[in-house]
UniProtKB/Swiss-Prot annotation:
Known partners and oligomeric status: Homotetramer. Forms an RuvA(8)-RuvB(12)-Holliday junction (HJ) complex. HJ DNA is sandwiched between 2 RuvA tetramers; dsDNA enters through RuvA and exits via RuvB. An RuvB hexamer assembles on each DNA strand where it exits the tetramer. Each RuvB hexamer is contacted by two RuvA subunits (via domain III) on 2 adjacent RuvB subunits; this complex drives branch migration. In the full resolvosome a probable DNA-RuvA(4)-RuvB(12)-RuvC(2) complex forms which resolves the HJ.
Gene field: ruvA
Stated name of the protein: Holliday junction branch migration complex subunit RuvA
GO molecular function, one term: ATP binding
Role played: The RuvA-RuvB-RuvC complex processes Holliday junction (HJ) DNA during genetic recombination and DNA repair, while the RuvA-RuvB complex plays an important role in the rescue of blocked DNA replication forks via replication fork reversal (RFR). RuvA specifically binds to HJ cruciform DNA, conferring on it an open structure. The RuvB hexamer acts as an ATP-dependent pump, pulling dsDNA into and through the RuvAB complex. HJ branch migration allows RuvC to scan DNA until it finds its consensus sequence, where it cleaves and resolves the cruciform DNA.
SMART domains per record: HhH1
Keyword NAD: no
Entry's Gene Ontology BP terms: DNA recombination; DNA repair
Chain intervals for the UniProt region annotation (Flexible linker): 143-153
Amino acid sequence: MIEYIKGEIAELSPATAVIDCNGLGYAVNISLNTYSAIQGKSSCKLYIYEAIREDAYVLYGFADKQERELFLLLISVSGIGGNTARMILSALSPAELVNVISTENANMLKTVKGIGLKTAQRVIVDLKDKIKTGAMAATAVGGAAGALLPAMNAEVQEEAIAALTMLGFAAAPSQKAVLAILKEEPDAPVEKVIKLALKRL
């Protein structure tokens, strides 16, 4: 079992990272919060969850243990798989997610693509007590996102659309949503654009 992967960042997008460990490249699925935490760094340490299925062996990586713990709690809920959990952790920071669950804010949770009211309520019912008793001080990994310098508009557009298609959205509606957001907020960093797009798609 892999606890963490530490190495140089060979490739990085808002949805995936390739970590080079002594010449071996690990492709890791990441959330937007983790992307914010490691963007601009030459190396990083990601805490790993291994999803082993008959047809695939997938790694999910997190910048800290708290986000991984939240991910594990989310996938323990019936109907929530790895990609849906990652999408929740891309739309909401760890601190926001803990707050949403502890305050039973199902309406906020169902703004995440793919989460209906019933699923949102199930997440809250199943995890409310676990959040309170777990080690959930919830430092928001994505808190530094707002401090990032605005990237080139075209580059932000390209990265955001690529990340959304990696998350399973069709290219055309992704492009439409991203362009609309950048028209409203031309200097928005890619993380913010993706978060806003996740609520519109």
